[in-house]
């Protein structure tokens, strides 16, 4: 309907009978009927070059009695809002909005657009006196030239404006003859037409005959455009009339009710309260015309359409075009050619005019219709309307200069706008570099600054036209910025349209984020203007641009507004509702507690509204509550219980370590040749979950998982249970009654703000079920009185693969099958383990720790055999306890698969393999003793060995098995230190030096008594059967006790055993009743201070001791332990055989920081302190003199640094290159030094950079020892970490 170049405006005045013909044929008015046929080709002569050109012109013909320009402040806003409400698609609504704005806006005083150029009079052959009707209509037209006249003008329209005086306005006369009319007569038709031609001239009179009497298929959809406009106009007028009635309705006290309209327009209504709600206010208008044109069929044929086109074509050729050519020629001669004195004078006003520029701008300037400026403007407008944009551009360009000189800025802005429109229409091929861009920059700003609010149609039209030109030139960003200027005017619906168009231009410019931002602004404005459908559409278009940007506030705003506006407009879809709920769930934890309560209620209400008939639980509440997938544990069967699972088990023992011990227990129960099947009872993120594990039928398959409330408000969950899929039964038919396992439910769970709770749910598979998989968590989220069924998928991710190049470049994970299970049809044995006695969590080195367990068969299967497997093969003993408290030791056997794993079979002298070890309901007691490690926790010389693993496995008669396991780990402290010294090689005399390492301040009493000394050999280190042939005899049998920080020495000698003698131990006391554990001696030397090539001594001397300790709080503790030292004579023999002194010094290197940050810009030198610990363990008991030396990279003088490779240059040096010190026997030297470093890198602060030269007493030969390598990372940073 609208176009860049306005259409010539033609007035239509008709008689009552002619309007009835239109109504009877299903049209609102005659202008409604002829609207589709107003475009025509014609020849127009250009006044400047006097050349004719063929132009296609579309006439805008309006019935003055029913159609016109709407009142700007009181009617037009409501019609524009109705145009926006017509469609739910924002682009289609804005297109209609622009059409309505262009057609209905009042004409501006600065232009001639919207002024009627000619008038068409229509009478019918049914009129009693058609010529008299013509006379009345001519008089009515003359009356309309009076601006105060309201004759024929509808109450919602402004007074019509005319381009020429009444006498000069061209008139055309049409006789309407409807053949359907019963009074129609061809004779009367011809007679009346002849009278008209005689009175008004043959060229000014025509006859329009309509012959159709039914609806034509050829004409279907021809009037859709004008019908849509009329529908919008009717609804807008009804709303405006309603508002006008409400505004003057008397209140309770007789005062009028000044209620503001729904749109933000704050103007005072000027529409008459007596105006009809719809249609025309002409006295001749049909009261039911609005109903007729909406409901009736349109009776018009193609012949009728051609007849109308012929009438209008003749009107153009003989009436309008000659008048326009004459008018353009007159205006061009009068004002268009005056380019000298007048323009020069006006251009000099800025130099010679009185007053300041500010005062001139403050006074609005208007021009008379016959002034030279308005004559130029009329000429330019006619040239543009009738297809001569080049000539129009020249006129507009000269005019805008004069108006700018006159400081008529509003008129100047309008002329500048049309200057751009004319130039673009004349030369559409111009690009951005060729077009006069400066013309586009200021019109909108000038109109906003200098035009009044009632001129908002001019501001909008200017902004739209300038933006269209910018867009055609490819300057989409500039087009968007130009439209954004409209935000400063009043009227939310007006600003919303401009913001939406600006968003489209930003999107075309590739500025997606700005486009979405402006769509959000537009949506807010549409919402304020009570247009929820378009508000929803703008929010919907903005939604994808903010996806996964983690902009919490914006995500929350978009989601809430979409749900609200979609509900108001009734246009919400389930897909968008799901996306909104997903975003609200994601952003809800970032909000304040009050907002979280409101948003949680919004989520539940949205789920209840948009998903009321769902068959499956919704899967949108993935984070409320949050399921901590890394905490998922699957427990296959009734044991172990949740409180028996060690959470830190993976930190102490690796998966391979557990498999080794499990395999040893399996072979001990089933034989060394039986294939290992595994017996994993608990699967978590640290276990091997690539295989599907077995779970017994008739027992619970339990799933433990942590649920976290991410909100700052409590949430209430009901009926929590697991979701199970992929169920298979023995018959292979899914869905049968037998294949559906029972699901355990947690009736109610409340999570306090930001609280994490561990829950345990289960699946109870029955016999006949072969396989199933847990795939989700089901629950009901309750808010107020509503609850919604929700489901959170449970899918565990395996460990990341990082072996091949492809796996390193892309994230590939192993399969995790911990939530899948196959069901074992045979029952598993089930034993309850109750820990009766267990030691303290911390212990002393070499202390004996006893664990007592009560075992009870609570299952439905007899336990045929049971065994204990441990990786501490040299530090564990096991046995059973009978009813009389008698302890029976079990025999230790090394595992078939690993010589460093020990197994103990729990047997009680049964003679038959069919005897059960533990019958159903039977109870027994067992124990196992563990000797603590010989080095304290955190010692620099402590071994890198695994913790003690205890695994008890048992099996039933049908071959199924189960296990119970523990990791013995705790803090260790040193209680006693032992060293051996050879006194006489011939008599094999030696001394044992004892020291109580507990400080006086650490305990009120610390007394250690030596009970026994024995010799032993470990067969695991040598492979030789334990048949040590010597025993140890103390020189004096005396009671040896040492208290805190005390020392003592025991002198003893090794004596060969006589033939048949087996006693290899000597007791120093006869009063003790202690039964020592029967564990083997240590298998190897544990200290890392030994050289890696040092020999391992299998022969040991064991010292059994008893300690009584009273700590500072008064707690009394008594326990035993056994410490082992190497046989000094075997050790000396081994060293002499190897002829090596490399084990005489024990060296360790430590640094205070493995990683240090230093600002090399502030200080070029970074200092890194290190500590060297050197222990003299020379077997020949000799003092030693050591020298610590720095090994320089550059050892010879060079002529320049450039001759040395960068990797060989000095980058680190030490504060003292040479350090010397003498170390006595068994003493330890502590040397502190500082490295100085110049570059950020990874440095070896020991290793090849330092060497130790040792000279032992009595020898002149120097022995070189190496310093262990210690890596330290020095990073460059803007700050220094001290």
Swiss-Prot record:
Biased composition (Low complexity): 255-273
GO biological process: collagen biosynthetic process
UniProt protein name: Trafficking protein particle complex subunit 8
Functional description taken from the UniProt entry: Plays a role in endoplasmic reticulum to Golgi apparatus trafficking at a very early stage. Involved in collagen secretion.
GO cellular component: TRAPPIII protein complex
Traits of the deletion mutant: RNAi-mediated knockdown reduces the abundance of collagen in the cuticle.
Gene: trpp-8
Domain of life: Eukaryota
Residue ranges that the Swiss-Prot or TrEMBL entry lists as coiled coil: none
One Pfam assignment: TRAPPC-Trs85
Region of interest (Disordered), ranges: 245-287
Listed InterPro entries: TRAPP_III_complex_Trs85 (IPR024420)
């Amino acid at each position: 309907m609208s176009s860049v170049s306005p259409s010539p405006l033609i007035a239509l005045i008709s008689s009552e009978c002619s309007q009835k013909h239109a109504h009877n044929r299903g049209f609102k008015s005659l202008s409604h009927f002829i609207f589709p046929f107003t475009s025509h080709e014609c020849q127009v002569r250009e006044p400047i070059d006097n050349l004719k050109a063929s132009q296609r012109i579309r006439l805008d013909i309006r019935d003055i009695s029913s159609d016109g320009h709407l009142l700007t402040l009181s009617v037009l806003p409501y019609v524009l809002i109705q145009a926006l409400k017509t469609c739910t698609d924002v682009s289609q609504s804005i297109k209609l909005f622009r059409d309505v704005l262009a057609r209905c806006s009042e004409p501006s005083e600065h232009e001639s657009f919207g002024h009627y150029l000619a008038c068409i009079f229509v009478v019918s052959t049914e009129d009693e006196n058609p010529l008299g009707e013509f006379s009345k209509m001519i008089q009515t037209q003359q009356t309309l030239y009076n601006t105060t006249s309201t004759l024929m003008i509808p109450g919602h329209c402004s007074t019509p404006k005319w381009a020429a005086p009444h006498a000069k306005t061209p008139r055309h006369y049409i006789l309407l003859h409807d053949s359907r009319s019963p009074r129609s007569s061809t004779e009367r038709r011809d007679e009346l037409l002849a009278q008209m031609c005689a009175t008004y001239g043959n060229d000014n009179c025509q006859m329009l005959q309509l012959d159709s009497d039914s609806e034509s298929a050829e004409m279907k959809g021809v009037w859709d455009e004008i019908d849509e406009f009329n529908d919008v106009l009717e609804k807008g007028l009804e709303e405006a009339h309603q508002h006008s009635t409400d505004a003057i309705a008397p209140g309770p006290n007789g005062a009028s009710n000044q209620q503001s309209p729904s749109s933000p327009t704050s103007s005072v209504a000027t529409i008459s309260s007596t105006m009809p709600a719809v249609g025309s206010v002409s006295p001749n208008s049909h009261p039911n015309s609005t109903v007729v044109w909406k409901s009736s069929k349109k009776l018009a044929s193609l012949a009728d359409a051609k007849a109308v086109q012929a009438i209008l074509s003749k009107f153009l050729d003989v009436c309008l075009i000659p008048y326009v050519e004459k008018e353009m020629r007159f205006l061009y001669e009068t004002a268009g050619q005056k380019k000298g004195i007048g323009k020069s004078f006006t251009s000099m006003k800025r130099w010679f005019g009185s007053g300041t520029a500010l005062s001139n701008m403050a006074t609005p300037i208007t021009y008379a219709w016959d002034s030279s400026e308005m004559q130029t403007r009329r000429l330019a407008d006619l040239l543009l309307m009738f297809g001569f944009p080049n000539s129009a551009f020249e006129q507009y360009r000269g005019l805008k200069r004069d108006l700018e000189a006159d400081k008529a800025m509003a008129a100047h802005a309008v002329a500048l706008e049309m200057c751009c429109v004319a130039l673009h229409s004349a030369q559409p091929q111009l690009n951005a570099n060729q077009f006069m861009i400066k013309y586009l920059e200021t019109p909108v700003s000038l109109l906003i600054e200098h035009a009044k609010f009632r001129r908002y149609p001019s501001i909008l039209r200017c902004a739209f036209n300038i933006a269209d030109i910018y867009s055609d030139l490819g300057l989409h960003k500039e087009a968007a910025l130009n439209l954004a200027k409209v935000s400063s005017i009043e009227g939310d619906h007006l600003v919303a349209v401009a913001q939406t168009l600006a968003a489209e231009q930003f999107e075309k410019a590739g500025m997606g984020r700005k486009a979405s931002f402006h769509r959000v602004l537009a949506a807010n404005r549409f919402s304020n203007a009570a247009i929820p459908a378009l508000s929803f559409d703008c929010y919907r278009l903005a939604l994808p641009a903010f996806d996964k940007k983690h902009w919490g506030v914006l995500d929350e705003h978009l989601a809430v507004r979409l749900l609200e506006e979609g509900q108001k407009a009734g246009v919400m879809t389930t897909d968008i509702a799901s996306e909104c709920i997903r975003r609200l769930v994601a952003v809800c934890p970032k909000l304040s507690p009050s907002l979280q309560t409101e948003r949680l209620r919004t989520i539940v209400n949205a789920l209840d509204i948009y998903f009321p008939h769902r068959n499956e639980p919704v899967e949108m509440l993935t984070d409320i509550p949050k399921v901590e997938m890394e905490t998922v544990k699957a427990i296959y069967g009734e044991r172990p219980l949740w409180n028996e699972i060690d959470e830190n088990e993976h930190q102490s023992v690796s998966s391979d370590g557990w498999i080794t011990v499990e395999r040893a227990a399996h072979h001990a129960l089933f034989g060394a040749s039986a294939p290992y099947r595994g017996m994993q009872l608990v699967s978590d993120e640290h276990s091997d979950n690539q295989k599907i594990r077995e779970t017994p039928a008739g027992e619970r398959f339990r799933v433990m998982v942590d649920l976290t409330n991410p909100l700052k408000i409590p949430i209430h969950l009901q009926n929590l249970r697991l979701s199970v899929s992929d169920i298979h039964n023995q018959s292979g038919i899914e869905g049968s009654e037998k294949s559906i396992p029972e699901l355990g439910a947690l009736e109610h769970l409340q999570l306090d703000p930001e609280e994490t709770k561990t829950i345990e749910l289960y699946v109870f598979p029955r016999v006949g079920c072969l396989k199933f998989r847990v795939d989700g968590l089901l629950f009901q989220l309750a808010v107020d009185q509503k609850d919604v069924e929700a489901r959170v998928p449970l899918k565990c991710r395996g460990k990341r693969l990082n072996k091949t190049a492809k796996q390193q470049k892309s994230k590939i994970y192993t399969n995790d099958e911990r939530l899948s299970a196959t069901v074992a049809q045979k029952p598993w044995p089930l034993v309850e383990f109750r820990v009766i006695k267990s030691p303290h969590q911390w212990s002393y080195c070499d202390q004996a720790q006893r664990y007592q367990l009560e075992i009870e068969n609570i299952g439905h299967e007899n336990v045929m055999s049971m065994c204990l497997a441990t990786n501490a093969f040299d530090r564990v003993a096991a046995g059973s306890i009978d009813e009389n408290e008698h302890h029976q030791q079990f025999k230790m056997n090394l595992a078939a698969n690993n010589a460093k794993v020990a197994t103990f079979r729990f047997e009680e002298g049964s003679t038959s393999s069919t005897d059960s070890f533990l019958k159903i309901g039977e109870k027994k007691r067992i124990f196992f003793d563990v000797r603590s490690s010989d080095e304290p926790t955190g010692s620099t010389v402590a071994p890198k060995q695994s913790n003690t693993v205890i695994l008890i496995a048992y099996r039933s008669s049908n071959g199924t098995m189960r296990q119970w396991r523990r990791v013995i780990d705790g803090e260790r402290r040193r209680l006693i230190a032992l060293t051996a010294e050879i006194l006489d090689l011939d008599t094999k005399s030696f001394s044992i030096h004892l020291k109580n390492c507990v400080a006086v301040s650490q305990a009120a009493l610390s007394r250690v008594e030596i009970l026994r000394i024995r010799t032993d050999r470990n067969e695991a280190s040598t492979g030789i059967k334990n048949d040590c042939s010597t025993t140890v005899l103390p020189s004096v049998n005396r009671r040896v006790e040492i208290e805190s920080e005390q020392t003592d020495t025991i002198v003893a000698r090794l004596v060969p055993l006589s033939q048949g003698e087996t006693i290899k131990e000597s007791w120093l006391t006869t009063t003790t009743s202690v039964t020592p554990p029967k564990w083997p001696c240590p298998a190897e030397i544990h200290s890392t201070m030994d050289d890696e090539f040092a020999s391992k001594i299998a022969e040991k001397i064991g010292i059994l001791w008893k300690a009584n300790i009273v700590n500072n709080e008064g707690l009394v503790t008594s326990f035993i332990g056994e410490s082992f030292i190497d046989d000094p004579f075997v050790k000396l023999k081994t060293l002499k055989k190897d002829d090596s002194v490399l084990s005489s010094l024990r060296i360790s290197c430590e640094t205070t920081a493995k990683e240090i940050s230093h600002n090399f810009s502030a200080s070029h030198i970074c200092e890194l302190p290190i500590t060297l610990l050197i222990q003299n363990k020379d077997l020949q008991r000799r003092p030693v003199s050591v020298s610590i030396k720095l090994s320089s990279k550059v050892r010879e003088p060079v002529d320049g640094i450039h001759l040395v490779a960068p990797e060989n240059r000095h980058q680190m040096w030490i504060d003292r290159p040479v350090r010397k010190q003498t170390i006595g026997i068994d003493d330890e030297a502590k040397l502190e030094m500082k490295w100085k470093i110049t570059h950020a890198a990874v440095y070896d602060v020991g290793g090849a950079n330092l060497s130790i030269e040792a000279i032992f007493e009595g020898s002149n030969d120097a022995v070189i020892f190496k310093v262990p390598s210690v890596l330290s990372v020095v990073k460059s940073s803007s700050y220094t970490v001290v």
